[in-house]
Amino acid sequence: MAENNLIQIYVTGGTFDKEYNFVNGQLFFRDTHLPQILELGRCSLNIDIKTLMMVDSLEMTDSDREIIIHNCAKSQARQILITHGTDTMVITAKAIAEAKIENKTIVLTGAMIPYAFGSSSDGFFNLGSALSFVQTLKVGVYIIMNGRYFEWNKVKKNTKTGFFEDIE
């Protein structure tokens, strides 16, 4: 039986969760920052966080996407939020939509600037927006970025501006 008020969050990596190595200037993964972000935001939602992988989305494979799809399909939650790198977020959203997972609202969000960079990160805003949208949008697959929601097949990332935009 589905827990209708549960929001399942799947962590997949992306800039959202990258750390900065002050010695060599490289970005790397350690652990997700979601528990700290939710605590800072005084979040009172019923949330379960599960890390599926920690990868840069440019390195995400079809096998990684199958893991995401499998977890979305088997989840008891009807509301699923996926943190994901922005470069291939639309590709993953397409794969999820084409899997035809029924009766679930699935949203993907990410960040252009790592949470570890502090208040300059857009991750706080995107996560909060995604948590709101996953509770209010109808069943389907969506990208949530920059305070907006986009249907999975009507969005692209503008690589010049770093913003997500509607497509016809």
Predicted regions and their residues:
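Active-site histidine-anchored catalytic micro-motif
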Residues: 2-168
